[in-house]
Amino acid sequence: MTIKNVIDVQSWETTQKKNVSVTHDKVKLNTRYVDKLIAIHECSALEANEIGFIARFLIKATLPHSKPRLNEWSRKNGNLTMHMMAPSAVGLPYGCYARLLLVWISTQAIRNKSKLDKGIITEQEVRKLELGRSQRRFMEALGLRSSGGKNGSIVPLREQMRRLFKTTISIMLAEINEENGYICEDEVGARVADVSHIWWSANYPERNLLSQSWVELSPKFFQLIIDKPVPLDMRVLRLIKRSPMALDIYCWATYRVSYLKRVTIIPWSGLMEQMGSNYADVKDFKRRFNDGLEKVQRAWPGLDATPTEKGLLIKPSAPQVPRRKKHRTEGY
């Protein structure tokens, strides 16, 4: 779908559906939305200073989309297996907010690593990420509006922060030698945060408090997220932030397109194993995936991906965020 298609759809919907109430799950194709699409199309993320990062392992194996019943979670993709565990009194992170938090954490960790390399900060400071004195400003950095009440954003974000910081993640890579039957397994486990200090006001999120809020990542988790991170366009994330599936698809497609050399069909079973959490069957997953893909392609018209009966047909195209050749820790 091109920018012109989006504008045409917007014009048609304005004429035909003036009185239709659009839910949060549907993109409201208004003038402001189209302006954002045009800005993404005309100016790169680098030029707009809107580059963020996500750890590669979080693309290969994703978080739950909705609240899981258990406090353990596993995802498998090829020879990589991710296992997550959280205290029963807290629970596992899930949904949109957890994903946006992980992008923010990955981005800040990469920036701190760059500062360390330049001698701006020390080894003792590199894993400490400052969240700021104002909850509203932190939420704006995530692309969220600060709102209270039963259906507001403040309480669920705080809950996802608590869940994420207390979670332990293990990554296992398995290699099998088919000739002699040898199996080699490499595994690393890490709690996300060693220490956190959150001091915000739920009643007055806009206030600057005396104490700075911060989180200190564990050494092993810090190393996991700075290892070959994938660059993202934060403007795209903000457009699709309400859909966990769309966020997963965008991050995955950005990485996949970066090395795709020929037309490929990815089976639905493989996609479901990687990111199809909490779905009853392949049919349900396909429907949700296609909805998410449509949201992504509105923001990224150059993504040449088409759902078929067998799987997703994806063709080589320009990465949404171009490769950077110089700094390996700041690109693919």
Label the model's feature ranges:
Residues 1-332:
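Charged, alpha-helix-forming regions
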